A protein has these predicted regions:
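Extended, small/polar residue-biased N-terminal targeting/export presequences
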Residues: 43-104, 150-180, 496-507, 512
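A structural signal for short loop-to-beta-strand junctions that line the ligand-binding cleft
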Residues: 90-91, 268, 327-329
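Acidic, polar loop-rich interaction surfaces within structured domains
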Residues: 282-285, 293, 300-304, 309-379, ...
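Short linear motifs in exposed loops
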Residues: 105, 134, 167, 329, ...
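Conserved functional hotspot residues or short segments at active or partner-binding sites
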Residues: 340-341, 345-512
Length: 512
């Protein structure tokens, strides 16, 4: 009976496809139907036909281009959450360290912050049940929940003899797009780090700019590095904030009429006129490339860093009958000067995501275009920065350091121990004073010997030569973790900026 039903459904699908597409794909559909029937008849064990068909749909869409995709119902819920900019829960950033949920930082203005959770706190029980070595899925199920509902957690805190219980009332938790914003006081240069383009991104940016302007900001750096994109509307509205004339921001070209659109600037209520730098790298994609490409083409910002990823395909998300969705590419993005953002993908998906091939395809396919004032810019995929600043080999080696990549997060743990030892000294400092102390030299007497002794005492494997080679970067990461624990993400990003060549270059451009 099961097989008969399936054959009837297959015939109906086949008939529909023939009506829609004509008879030319008939042999392909026959072949698919034959493979399905043979698999059901001959496969050595039972299998879920729905799972198999989902795999077939995924494969079909992946064959079209790297960004058309099938999204399951469960995946779609998570993706929608990211774009909507909120979820319901207790509000912590965490890692599972030594088997326990360890608080990296409480999210500001959430139940966890209001209850006084601290970086380094270990959640050992949830609602009376052990939380030791539970899966991420279980963590989500137990800590997230309806706004107003209650969850009890037992906390083990460094310095406390006994664990203690906290009752939290779940609430709406914002997923921030702007994750850091601060000002370099002496130069009056503002810095804003944006990590996604969601429903509330422009609103968050506007609030950050208002706060920075009230502190005397005169110039601005927007950091879009490793920002993989998001909503087109937010990218367009962000560019519009910094334009005072009617200009094309981005346009799209596709096969169907509705896919051909031009997005223009309007008379913005913001109309920000200060000098700007946009920072990008090869993790900057889609909406990030629309923003950086438009502001570069319209001579509104200087672009610093590395060329961007080159994702310039427009997807339309279409809901399917079971709550899943298909994202189908309907058009390509072009910057105001006519540059196609999408880089070639005819060598296959594996090659498309290979970092070395990204450089090769973009370098090979360079084309010349001109900004509004006549300055030369390059197309062929991705956005080319005005100042190409690559990290040196020393920093690239640090990124691969075994201690830095260790899932036990030794740098975070060591920083937490140093913070506890020096708590009375740190409590007397402001955020700005802390930054000044670090800039002067070896604050808190951090040294390699102490760190290595700590690694040994905690049975953490390391390579001595790597520690010696990378100590400058490790030291600033320790300072950044201490700062994050005391004052939040702003000081963390500011401290890491002390070894960030791309940020240093951006500051120097705006100072000149």
């Amino acid at each position: 009976m099961r097989k008969t039903k399936f054959i009837i459904v297959s015939i109906l699908i086949l008939g529909f496809c023939m009506i829609q597409f004509g008879a030319s794909p008939l042999s392909a559909f026959k072949k698919l139907n034959q493979v399905i029937s043979l698999s059901q008849e001959l496969y050595f064990e039972e299998f879920d036909i729905n799972d198999a068909m989902e795999g077939a749909i995924k494969g079909f869409l992946e064959e079209l281009d790297p960004h058309s995709q099938y999204i399951s119902k469960k995946e779609l819920e998570s993706i929608n959450e990211q774009f909507e900019g909120e979820f319901e829960g207790i509000g912590i950033e965490y890692s599972v360290l030594d088997g326990y949920i360890t608080v990296i930082s409480p999210i500001p203005e959430t139940p966890s912050e209001r209850a006084g959770l601290q970086p380094g706190d270990k959640i050992i029980k949830i609602n009376g049940e052990s939380a030791y070595k539970i899966s991420n899925d279980e963590i989500f199920k137990k800590l997230r929940g309806r706004k107003g509902s209650e969850v009890k957690i037992h906390i083990l805190r460094v310095g406390e003899v006994e664990p203690f219980e906290i009752t939290l009332i779940r609430d709406k938790i914002p997923i921030k797009s702007v994750i850091a914003s601060f000002i370099f006081d002496e130069s009056k240069i503002g810095y804003v780090k944006i990590n996604r383009f969601a429903n509330n991104t422009v609103q968050e940016l506007a609030q950050s700019l208002f706060d920075l302007e009230s502190q005397g900001m005169q110039k601005l750096i927007i950091d879009l590095r490793n920002n993989g994109g998001g909503l087109l509307s937010q990218a367009v509205n962000m560019v519009d904030m910094f334009l005072s004339s009617n200009d094309t921001i981005v346009y799209t070209k596709g096969k169907i009429r509705s896919a051909n659109e031009v997005y223009y600037s309007s008379k913005s209520i913001y109309d920000k006129t200060y000098e700007m730098v946009i920072m990008i790298n090869n993790g900057s994609a889609s909406a990030s490339e629309i923003v950086s490409g438009a502001l570069q083409d319209l001579d509104r910002a200087t672009i610093v860093g590395e060329r961007s990823f080159g994702k310039g395909l427009v997807q339309r998300q279409i809901p399917l009958m079971d709550g899943s969705a298909a994202r189908i590419t309907i058009a390509q993005y072009f910057t105001p000067s006519g540059r196609l953002i999408q880089r070639p993908y005819d060598e296959g998906i594996g090659n498309y995501y290979d970092e070395s091939s990204i450089e090769d395809t973009i370098t090979t396919n360079k084309s010349i275009h001109y900004t509004k004032s006549g300055k030369t810019v390059y197309g062929g995929g991705g956005i080319w920065p005005d100042f190409n600043i690559s990290y040196d080999e020393n920093f690239n080696q640090f990124l691969k350091n075994k201690v830095r990549l260790n899932t036990k997060r030794p740098i975070f743990k060591f920083a937490n121990d140093i913070k506890i030892i020096n708590e009375s000294k740190l409590n007397k400092l402001t955020e700005e004073k802390y930054y000044q102390e670090i800039s002067k030299g070896n604050f808190l007497n951090l040294n390699q010997t102490k760190f290595i002794e700590w690694l040994d005492s905690n049975n953490i494997k390391y390579n001595y030569e790597e520690i010696k080679r990378d100590w400058r970067y490790i030291k600033y990461d320790i300072y950044a973790e201490i700062g994050n624990s005391m004052w939040g993400k702003n000081i963390s990003y500011k401290v890491r900026g002390l070894y960030d060549k791309q940020l240093i270059k951006s500051i120097n451009i705006l100072k000149d």
